[in-house]
Amino acid sequence: MATSNEAGSVLNRVPPLLTDLYQMAYAYWRAGRHNEPAVFELFFRDNPFGGGFSLFAGLSDCLLFLQNFSFSDDDVQYLRSVLPADTDAGFFSYLKELDCSCVSVSAVPEGSVVFARVPLLEVSGPLAVVQLLETSLLCLVNYASLVCSNAARFRLAAGPRRRLMEMGLRRAQGPDGGLTASRYTYIGGFDLTSNALAGRLYGIPVAGTMAHSYITSFSSLEEVWPQTLKPCGGGDSIDFICLVKGLLGRVCQLLGSKTNLIREGELAAFLSYAIAYPQNFLPVIDSYSVRCSGLLCFCAVALALFELQYRPLGVRLDSGDLCRQSLDVRRVFRECSKHFSVPQFESLIIVGTNSISEQSLSELNKKDNEIDVVGVGTHLVTCTRQPSLGCVYKLVEVRGRPRMKLSEDPEKSTLPGRKAVYRLLDADGHPQMDVLCLCDEAAPAAGVELQCFSLLGNSTLQCSITPAQVSSLRTQVFSCGQITLPLNSASESRERAQISLQMLNPYHKRLQEPHNYTVALSERLHSLVSDIKKGNSKGSNFLLSN
């Protein structure tokens, strides 16, 4: 279940004024249409990153936003100052009383695998109110789903064994972008974050290493203070510097390395850090030279920690050929483990970071390497391959009548009417097809052949399918101003995402040239679309948009 920290984070970031000014719905109110019952759908048109799927995220934030939607007196006063001077004063009184008590929402569960053209949210209620919600809901879903999907692709590229750490806060588009990224990359499959606030708010495991600046700030062993460390089990303090210097000589002798190439400042930094964090010692070892200094200093300090009954964690590599260096580091770990009779030494963690992208992670996975944890920042949180998911929020029904946008760009046409969404599964539980039906149609049945029309770009193709299993994809999550289901925590949504991805066929999960997943229309919905296009449907409408 979501924590109070998560709820507070959303409420502080997403007030009702987080919307486009043109959404203020004054014209609806002026025409007396503001209370007409209406239905909108939120969906995206194309799967992101050239892939075969997306993950739906942002639902919890949307529901918290809806539950607390109301304009303050200060909000209304500000709107008075920016709307035209001749705006009817009654409209501002209307805004003061506005809330979502008459709004209902059905949604796909957060963390679910979803596909293009499938309505993720159905929002129904008074026309002016549900129109006012458009920008905020899009803002909450677009980036969350995009970065969550990006994280899932990184997870697929990395494979199940390797741990992934999100460390993109300093590269993100502002603090809110960084916080959102930390949460939704965790849901998408990352294991850790470097973002301390995200750890506090969302319960995400937090990890970190050492900055290069910490190492380069030292130049001499004389700067190390304190110079002693007590054994983990208690007892008198040990001269840690003396212990490490003795071990460093033995390490260099074992490996045939030259002691005169070791950077004293790097050794001093490692000593100081180990004394401060004896249970979490994981330094970056490439500030100068991995082979000639960083790795040697680490081994000496780590062996000293083991001798005092502490358990160092490992090292981080942040430049150069990560695969080759990781193999060299692991070889040295094994030699030290055997020579110094410290079995745990050979299994110390190796973290790799260095502007990791999905492509470089896939390439890394094809080569021999000993990297246990990969840290990803820029390419993850900024979604460099695609900056936006492109979710849209479109009117599909007013006063019980279907509405359809007919566009000069066929890709921007919408599907009319209130719908139910079903996922058809094969005998192994793999999704085969998502079918959109009108809400008053009977649900597809397992073992019964279904005639439908698959969406192929801007056209449709008649097809038939006999599903082994059928599941309804959406459930009601908001009604009468209240959230109707417990909100999932980040870890609960993450678990759903993992299960949902495991169920997906491998050929839909391929990072390159995946098979297209079929989304189809029922026969009745297809007929409605055809009738409206021909102008034959009662109450049909034609909205042209460039």
From Swiss-Prot:
Activity is highest with Mn(2+). Transmembrane segments: none annotated. Its main location: cytoplasm. GO terms for biological process: NAD biosynthetic process via the salvage pathway; response to oxidative stress. The modification Phosphohistidine is found at H212. Keywords: Cytoplasm, Ligase, Magnesium, Manganese, Metal-binding, Phosphoprotein, Pyridine nucleotide biosynthesis, Transferase. It is found in: Cytoplasm, Cytosol. It catalyses: nicotinate + 5-phospho-alpha-D-ribose 1-diphosphate + ATP + H2O = nicotinate beta-D-ribonucleotide + ADP + phosphate + diphosphate. This is Nicotinate phosphoribosyltransferase. It comes from Danio rerio.
